[in-house]
Amino acid sequence: MTAEEFDFSSHSHRRYNPLTDSWILVSPHRAKRPWLGQQEAAYKPTAPLYDPKCYLCPGNKRATGNLNPRYESTYIFPNDYAAVRLDQPILPQNDSNEDNLKNRLLKVQSVRGNCFVICFSPNHNLTIPQMKQSDLVHIVNSWQALTDDLSREARENHKPFKYVQIFENKGTAMGCSNLHPHGQAWCLESIPSEVSQELKSFDKYKREHNTDLFADYVKLESREKSRVVVENESFIVVVPYWAIWPFETLVISKKKLASISQFNQMVKEDLASILKQLTIKYDNLFETSFPYSMGIHQAPLNATGDELSNSWFHMHFYPPLLRSATVRKFLVGFELLGEPQRDLTSEQAAEKLRNLDGQIHYLQRL
């Protein structure tokens, strides 16, 4: 087969992810195969405005006995079942007299920190695409305020906070244990592996090309258009060239902003707007409450000069659904043992999302 005959939309190929320094196998011809495997339960929008049994609804008692205030906007509280804690002893360093083989292979670090729950709305049955944009601005404001507060706690009170990972798991398909719209923030004294790898990649790219990786990538995607889903003055949303999940997207700041702490009011409103449009498109794709895991990647708290210089605010959305509201992608077999693989090309996925309404939610048309 000659190069002229190769078709990216039909033939297998590998794509490089410069953020993680890894490759993904793309097999577009597999999208036509029949599916007889597991199917997720289709989402039925039957949740009430208020659930007296919900641990996150205003005025309700949580499992620990703590009482929620009757909050009317976003509400943040320390996670009752935090993955990391402040009140634990520091692990001593390995004894240098121990077996060298053990020291080389069995490495361990103590990790302290704090975790928070971020209730997006007092309404039990509202997800991000169904909220008013003004409510989404409140969410963005809460992300910024939490980032600033944790940075100040580390700086002034010497709390062991180095990085805050803000994220949301939406839907039971993503392991969400409570359907009340909420996200989380885990603040650790170390930089998580995914973020650390990105920072290394950003640093390497800048040293080799004397510019920022995302500056070049935003320029490239704006020029090619084929992977762009939606954009506004401050942000561009793309299905990345190297996407693993079928309808994975990147929300990237068009200008270099290292952290949400640097956002002015206009940028915060633009982020709220782009998130609403993107998530409406997601829900409209299969006319379901589209599950995903999403999160912010930004500069570490009280970043060093190099960390600040290398960081560029962006958000990852990882939705599992593949071809319908009930058929999801699984990372198994070759993808666990070899490398990730996808069927639908990034360009095909972006076209589907781009052509969907990003203003009117499908439930408004019922």
UniProtKB/Swiss-Prot annotation:
Binds 1 zinc ion per subunit. Zinc binding seems to play a structural role. The modification Phosphoserine is found at S27. It catalyses: alpha-D-galactose 1-phosphate + UDP-alpha-D-glucose = alpha-D-glucose 1-phosphate + UDP-alpha-D-galactose. Fe cation binds at E198, H297, H314, H316. UDP-alpha-D-glucose binds at A63, N79, D80, N169, Q184, K329, F330, L331, V332, F334, E335. The keyword Iron applies. GO terms for cellular component: cytoplasm. It is an enzyme of class 2 (transferase). GO terms for molecular function: UDP-glucose:hexose-1-phosphate uridylyltransferase activity; zinc ion binding. It holds the Pfam family GalP_UDP_transf. Pathway: Carbohydrate metabolism; galactose metabolism. Keywords: Carbohydrate metabolism, Galactose metabolism, Iron, Metal-binding, Nucleotidyltransferase, Phosphoprotein, Transferase, Zinc. Its EC number is 2.7.7.12. CDD domains: GalT. The active site is at H182. Its cofactor is Zn(2+). Belongs to the galactose-1-phosphate uridylyltransferase type 1 family. This is Galactose-1-phosphate uridylyltransferase. It comes from Saccharomyces cerevisiae (strain ATCC 204508 / S288c). The gene is GAL7.
